[in-house]
């Protein structure tokens, strides 16, 4: 009987040990979840490392801060664009709504000076072109 049953006993012990290890092991938490933001902190950190001129040296909190800024700006633009689309009674945000939202806000306009494809132009009529009715 030597050799019979011994292997099963060892296998049972290792399985029990693995279950104990699984209990002790914590589920990995992403840096985005730790910071409480939706934008990917790890991906932004990798992009910062490849683009920085300091030989890939980027602080750990720099990526969290950058992701937070990007998330805030995105939420701000989407909120204003959603308001613009709601004013026009449309359910889908288009580049036109983004253009109206960005150009309507003074701070976002100075931050985003580039052209938005398909955004059109901002409606504006110069004061001198408006027909003035005078009572005489």
From Swiss-Prot:
A biological-process GO annotation: negative regulation of DNA-templated transcription
Region (Disordered): 1-35
Keywords of the record: Chromosome, DNA-binding, Nucleosome core, Nucleus
InterPro entries recorded: Histone-fold (IPR009072), Histone_H2A (IPR002119), Histone_H2A/H2B/H3 (IPR007125), Histone_H2A_C (IPR032454)
Molecular function per GO: DNA binding; protein heterodimerization activity; structural constituent of chromatin
Localization per Swiss-Prot or TrEMBL: Nucleus; Chromosome
Entry's Gene Ontology cellular component terms: nucleosome; nucleus
Listed Basic and acidic residues bias regions: 18-27
UniProt induction comment: Restricted to actively growing cells. Peak of accumulation in the G1/S boundary and in the S phase.
Highest taxon in the source lineage: Eukaryota
CDD domains per UniProt: HFD_H2A
Subunit structure: The nucleosome is a histone octamer containing two molecules each of H2A, H2B, H3 and H4 assembled in one H3-H4 heterotetramer and two H2A-H2B heterodimers. The octamer wraps approximately 147 bp of DNA.
Record's function text: Variant histone H2A which may replace conventional H2A in a subset of nucleosomes. Nucleosomes wrap and compact DNA into chromatin, limiting DNA accessibility to the cellular machineries which require DNA as a template. Histones thereby play a central role in transcription regulation, DNA repair, DNA replication and chromosomal stability. DNA accessibility is regulated via a complex set of post-translational modifications of histones, also called histone code, and nucleosome remodeling.
Similarity comment text for this entry: Belongs to the histone H2A family.
Protein name, UniProt field: Histone H2A variant 1
Organism for this UniProt entry: Arabidopsis thaliana
């Amino acid at each position: 009987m030597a050799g019979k049953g011994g292997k099963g006993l060892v296998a049972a012990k290792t399985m029990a040990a693995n279950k104990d290890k699984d209990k002790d092991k914590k589920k990995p938490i992403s840096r985005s979840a730790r910071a409480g933001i939706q934008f990917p902190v790890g991906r932004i950190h990798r992009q910062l490392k490849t683009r920085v001129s300091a030989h890939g040296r980027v602080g750990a909190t720099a990526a969290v801060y950058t992701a937070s800024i990007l998330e805030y700006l995105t939420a701000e633009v989407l909120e204003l664009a959603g308001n613009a689309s709601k004013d026009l009674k449309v359910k889908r945000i288009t580049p036109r709504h983004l253009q109206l939202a960005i150009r309507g806000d003074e701070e976002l306009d100075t931050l985003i000076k580039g052209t938005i494809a398909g955004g059109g132009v901002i409606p504006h009529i110069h004061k001198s072109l408006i027909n003035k009715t005078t009572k005489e």
